[in-house]
Amino acid sequence: MTELGAVDALAASIPATPWFTRVGQPLSDSDRANVTAYVAALDLPAGPVEPVGTWKEASRVAADPDWDRRWWQAEAREQRRLQAWAEERHGTEATLTALTHVTEAALDPTRAAAEAASDEALSKVAAGAAAQACHLAALALAAGKPSHGFVIKHRIFAAGRWPLGRVGERWYLF
C-alpha cells in the first residue's frame, strides 16, 4: 500500500472506531504500554500512567495549571517536521488533500462520541483532540513513518481512550 493509500485507509476506518468507549475503565497493560511508547517516541520524560475515572476528573486534569507544556511543544515540532517530509514526498497539494480528507472524516464521528461528556466545552475539546490525533497519524503515514509516535497516539484513541497529558510527574489517560 502506498503512503497516501495508508492515509485513505485511515480515513475509511474512522467511522467504525470506538471513540471514547473505554474512558473511565481500568487501564490495561496494553494501554500503559501504548502511552509509554508514545511518550518515548516524542522523547518526553517518562512517568507513571494514571487512570482518569470520570469526565469531570478529565476536565480537571486538562485544566490543571501544572499541565506540562513540553508535550504540546514536542508535538508541534514533530508536526512541522513530518509536514515538510510529506510535502517533499508527495507535493503540497496532494498532502493537504489527503490530510483534509482524514480531518473531515473525523469530525462527525469524534464529535458524536464525545457527547458523553456532560460539559459541552469538554465535549468539544475531546472531539478536537481525537480529530487532531487522526490528522497527526495521517501526517506520519504520509511522511512514510508508520510506527511514528503519532500513529501510536491514534492507536490510544482508537482503543477508546483519551491521553490527557502530563501533570507533575504523571501521565494521565482517560
Residue ranges and their predicted role:
Residues M1-F174:
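Short, glycine-biased loop/turn motifs at secondary-structure junctions and
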